[in-house]
Amino acid sequence: MIFLKIIHFISAAIVQGIPLLYVQAPGKLGFSEEGPMPGLENNTYQKLNDFLAELDKADIDYVDTREWMSGPDGFYDTDHHWTTETCFDIAAGLGRLLNSEYGFNIDEAALDASNYDFETHKDAFLGAEGRRTGRYYAGLDDFTVITPAFDTDFHVEIESKETGHSERDGSFEDTIMDSTKDTVHYSFDDSAYYAYWGGDYGRAEASNNKIDDDSSIVVIKDSYGIPVTAFLTNMFHKVNVIDIRYYESDKKLRDVIAEADPDMVMFIYGSGYLGKKKMFKIK
């Protein structure tokens, strides 16, 4: 049923002449059949393999990000999300793939880690699982804030379930980042992971004023796509980010995509949403 939902959307995208790429974030249990502990079964690994095999049969382009990672070490110990360093590597890998396989012309400088500042704060992050068990059981993670070392200038518009419409202008740090998120000291009340974008929103649109072409992508994502899409904003003139879980506008998503007229529509989903029909319900 879920696969049919994806096929339905892809058919509509093809009619519009828009290439589509599905990007699979694996989750910690997606690298082997081994369970999290003795006696607990792990269905994630086989479910991922089966799902991607179906995409192969349907000739749908996808990226299995497990092939770009060395294993579950790319995730936080206290959280289910991948680290910001992993997110940067995935975003840069996507940029190189789009250049080599899809005819994009992304500036290689935006893909080069040496053009970014990596500031690591020790014992600064207590993730979702860590907040449930406590820091003395789970320990603490280091948290790395990655920002461009080059000049940036953005206009960002956000549609939030809680705060409505807002706009930001300025540098990457002033627009894509949220300075209210503490990335230096761990917290039981908030997550440094959301220092990128500020959280999950129904829709966010970033216009990069330093890129003077008309390059544009639409990314439909869950929380695994938050830092990844933040880094993608340095590669395109316009990036539209949509989270179906929080999208409440009366405007149909198909119309939003058509108006954006993107060069590509991209899904970035973790393995936990393969069983959620609503995540592929594009109206």
Regions found by a protein language model. Give the residues of each.
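Extracellular glycan-modifying ectodomains
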Residues: 1-283
